[in-house]
UniProtKB/Swiss-Prot annotation:
Name of the gene: plsX
PANTHER family: FATTY ACID/PHOSPHOLIPID SYNTHESIS PROTEIN PLSX (PTHR30100), PHOSPHATE ACYLTRANSFERASE (PTHR30100:SF1)
Catalyses which reaction(s): a fatty acyl-[ACP] + phosphate = an acyl phosphate + holo-[ACP]
Pfam families xrefs: FA_synthesis
Molecular function (Gene Ontology), one example: phosphate:acyl-[acyl carrier protein] acyltransferase activity
Membrane-crossing segments per the record: none
Family the UniProt entry places it in: Belongs to the PlsX family.
Name by which UniProt lists this protein: Phosphate acyltransferase
Amino acid sequence: MTVRIAIDAMGGDLGPRATVLGSLQALSMHPDLEIQMYGPREALEDELETLPKRLSGYRSRLVLHDAPRVISQAMRVASALREAEGSSMLGALSGVREGRAQACVSAGNTGALMALGRRELGTISGISRPAISTAVPTQDGGRCYLLDLGANVDVQTRHLVDFARMGAVMARVVDEVAVPRVALLNIGVEANKGVPSVRDADRCLREDASRRIGDGTFDYIGYLEGDGIFSGAADVVVCDGFVGNAVLKASEGLATMLLTRLQETFEAHLTTRMVRAMARPALLRLKRRLDPVRYNGASLLGLAGIAVKSHGGADAKGFAYAVSRAVREIDMDLPAHLARALSDEGAAKPSTHSAAAVGGRVDSGLASDARPDDSHPQR
């Protein structure tokens, strides 16, 4: 079965230089994939002319759509909504809405993508604020879903509860975790720690659990501190978008620094170069495990269609990973699973134990709707 994905080719720091090459790399990885690419036709054709010969054969599965306007990274959400007509981002989302594609991938302005996604695709019933989620590696070889990553920098209790429910469905559907362990990110595990919205969300999740002991769809384990994200103590970690984005960016920076320093250390002297040659297979495995590029692509959970956000600074390889994430979500029919699960629940149905024991106007939720200095605080 052919899988069709709409690409906003003009998003991201590198623009079509990364998105065009990354899209062709994705086509080489997925033989059933067809890409609908939106952007200024002349610019896209120029990039296609520079493709390596090994990728030129995949152009037959790439369809160009002329979309001359670009939504910049600095554009505020309200401006993007007003000026979206003719843009590559709106074109890609419209392709999903009109059935020409099954998913959209963009490296563009996150706030604009979320707001336009809500307008064009709608949201799943019962979800007022979609959230951005991605998986991060854990030391036990597994993955942990972190959300929100920047779509909602100012959240209420009910939004955090919704994020917990959506993250649990993501872990069940994508990673086949039977009963995902869900935690709230906090500055301590004590009951009195954290801001009011986090404490209230903790209370709501615990009260829900006490009413539904034995029929849980996820296991609420309470508060988790930052170091627990990578320990494997939880399958889903929930926080507001400001905190989540800061955690993700700091983690990416740390991973990049560690890999760079490790390589520099092994290259410093002849003896270590010899050791490096012998240790090369293990080093490559470590790099593959920690390289942030491999985890590129964040899901906009809660939309009624599939939209994947690529990191703005991603290169072609990273963008290809984001496209692959969209392919997987199509295969899993993720929005339908979310809609069914949340409809069946009506409200969350977690079981619970302590984390300490295991170790008009589209309201985007963004501060950029109110303060121009925060116009793009997210990925």
